[in-house]
Amino acid sequence: MSETPTACLIGWPAAHSRSPIIHKYWLKELGIAGDYRIEAVEPAAFPDFIASLAARGYCGANVTIPHKEKALALSLPDARARAVGAANTLYFRDDKLHSTNTDVEGFIGNLDASAQRWRADDDAVVLGAGGSARAVVFGLIERGVPRIHLVNRSRERAQALAQPYGERVSVASWDDVESLLPKAGLVVNTTSLGMKGQPPLPLDVALLRADATVADLVYVPLRTELLTAAAGRGLQTADGLGMLLHQAVRGFELWFGRRPQVSPALRALVEADLTVK
């Protein structure tokens, strides 16, 4: 590894990532002489790249599409990475390559910061059953949420996600959503519905309780129709950009030894980049 601690983002493609903006901001803010780079690595070349990560001068890495599952297999994963089935953060300890999934911490950290009155002792409805949903469900289980209703078009995929958690996670269909919403203290959209270029999420926020919290993992656009409607009702909301920022905290801490803060100034910087792009 180089004397200057350096981390990278590995993906294919990877040029669209905002991670360099986030980590370079923290390096400068904390006065750390480090660096963060982008590495575009084809799937076929990924195993060799990981095997030579330290030799290339890196103290760790973020991993994005399509490498997250392979990163899990090529490292020593923690409980979060194993539960989610994917690793997005790699780091060295005692010359061994370890991995975690910081989406779990990112989701919960953003929820705590953006919707401070959300309650972990209340039921939750999670929409979608992909990789993001796995991180959300594991995070909610860690925090003690008693029951999670998992809604997905493919019941089989939802059942595979729910199975390890027993009765605490139940599978529901989209036809069940209207009956579930009035009982839920938290609703989380992990699907691409509402994203730029995608249809909006068909969810009636009028059915939610006045003390409910609505989280949307989409961050382009910053304010989805779902979050706009929820805020219009006076409900607490948490957006996808907040999760992106909070999930970066743990990786930075593992690589550079300092735990950074998600500040309004950092958020404004990334928001400006999203607007330009």
From Swiss-Prot:
Classification via CDD domains: NAD_bind_Shikimate_DH
E.C. designation(s): 1.1.1.25
Coiled coil: none
Residues annotated to bind shikimate: 17-19, 64, 88, 103, 219
The protein's role, per its UniProt record: Involved in the biosynthesis of the chorismate, which leads to the biosynthesis of aromatic amino acids. Catalyzes the reversible NADPH linked reduction of 3-dehydroshikimate (DHSA) to yield shikimate (SA).
Entries under PANTHER family matching the protein: BIFUNCTIONAL 3-DEHYDROQUINATE DEHYDRATASE_SHIKIMATE DEHYDROGENASE, CHLOROPLASTIC, SHIKIMATE DEHYDROGENASE
Family statement: Belongs to the shikimate dehydrogenase family.
Identification of the protein by name: Shikimate dehydrogenase (NADP(+))
